[in-house]
């Protein structure tokens, strides 16, 4: 199963991203030390990696794509990205006048950003 790189939290509960080139390289080195036959990773573009700022997912995915294209070993390692997406961007609480297609859990990018992001992934891969 692929490793999910979601980011980390420190002892002060600060969010620490782990999607940068150096983080992916460190993961690859750890996998190589274990002699894994099929190392794989999926990068979570939200949560701790975005410091829960859902619009940052667009920039993070771009950086992950750049990392994959820069290093052939990392291109083989990084199998995908996880993005929080829904029809309407943001989030809402349950009750009252709810908006169809808007998340009731984590904030998400909306449909337009999702389409642009998928197009970018298709172009860069």
Residue ranges and their predicted role:
Residues 1-12:
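Single conserved hydrophobic/aromatic residue that forms the stacking wall/gate
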Residues 10, 40-42, 78-82:
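Structural preference for beta-strand elements that scaffold enzyme active sites
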Residues 14-15, 46-50, 81-88:
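Active-site beta-loop-alpha junctions enriched in small/polar residues
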Residues 20-36, 64, 68-70:
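Structured alpha-helical segments in the cores of large, soluble enzyme domains
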Residues 43, 110:
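Conserved, mostly hydrophobic/aromatic
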Residues 49-61, 91-96:
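Short glycine/threonine-rich loop-to-helix capping motif typified by GTGT followed
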Residues 64-91:
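Substrate-binding cleft of secreted/luminal carbohydrate-active enzymes
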Residues 111-124:
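PLP-dependent enzyme catalytic core of the Aspartate aminotransferase-like
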